[in-house]
Swiss-Prot record:
Pathway involvement of the protein, from the record: Cofactor biosynthesis; 7,8-dihydroneopterin triphosphate biosynthesis; 7,8-dihydroneopterin triphosphate from GTP: step 1/1
Protein name (Swiss-Prot/TrEMBL): GTP cyclohydrolase 1
Organism lineage string: Bacteria, Bacillati, Actinomycetota, Actinomycetes, Mycobacteriales
Subunit structure: Homomer.
SUPFAM superfamilies: Tetrahydrobiopterin biosynthesis enzymes-like (SSF55620)
């Protein structure tokens, strides 16, 4: 299992705007570049379709992470909160092909016992997955966003994913799974807490 440090700028975000016309023009040029005719039947609408798909696939670029973790509850809970097997679909920034898998996200609330809704954790995973990504950074961004908003005593994030850039090109090893982890706070400093969380995550 690979551990990760904080990626640069993971706790800040500049909201961007999607340029539909520019994306369509770029896809049209790409079709020319591979020797296709973008005006032929079957491809005439492809630039617009791909642009719309990219807008959806990269929607995380256009959403402020702070808007996702905007609901807190004072539950005075001081034990582990763990959400397992959160499906994720992301796009490798090196080849712009998909990687997909699951995320396991856990945290121990801070001294104030503040927690967020379980659906908010899933939305946070989705937000960071919907960007051009590398798995290591994705894992750290999820962890750092929870640290920033919840001020918890500890955070652990484990992501398991298959990368199509390894399955359909290059070494062509379908089924290979990459596992990354990010630990913060108590899970980084206390081996027993980390082992307990990992046991719960890996238990089927």
């Amino acid at each position: 299992m690979a551990g990760n440090g904080s990626a640069p700028d993971t706790a800040t975000h500049q909201v961007r705007q999607f340029d539909q016309a520019r994306a369509e023009a770029a896809v049209r040029e790409l079709l020319f570049a591979i020797g296709e005719n973008p005006d032929r039947h079957g491809l005439a609408e492809t630039p617009a379709r791909v642009a719309r798909a990219y807008r959806e696939m990269f929607a995380g670029l256009y959403t402020d992470p702070d808007s996702v973790l905007n609901t807190m509850f004072d539950e005075e809970h001081d034990e582990l909160v763990l959400v397992k097997e959160i499906p994720l679909y992301s796009t490798c920034e090196h080849h712009l092909v998909s990687f997909h898998g699951v995320a396991h996200v856990g945290y121990i609330p801070g001294n104030d016992g503040r927690v967020t809704g379980l659906s908010k954790i899933a939305r946070l995973v989705d937000l960071y997955a919907k960007r051009p990504q590398v798995q290591e950074r994705l894992t750290s961004q999820i962890a750092d966003a929870l640290v920033k908003k919840l001020n918890p005593r500890g955070v652990i994030v484990v992501v398991e994913a298959e990368h199509l850039c390894m399955a359909m090109r290059g070494v062509r090893k379908p089924g290979a799974v990459t596992t990354t982890s990010a630990v913060r706070g108590l899970f980084k400093t206390n081996a027993a807490s980390r082992a307990e969380a990992l046991d719960l995550i890996l238990r089927k």
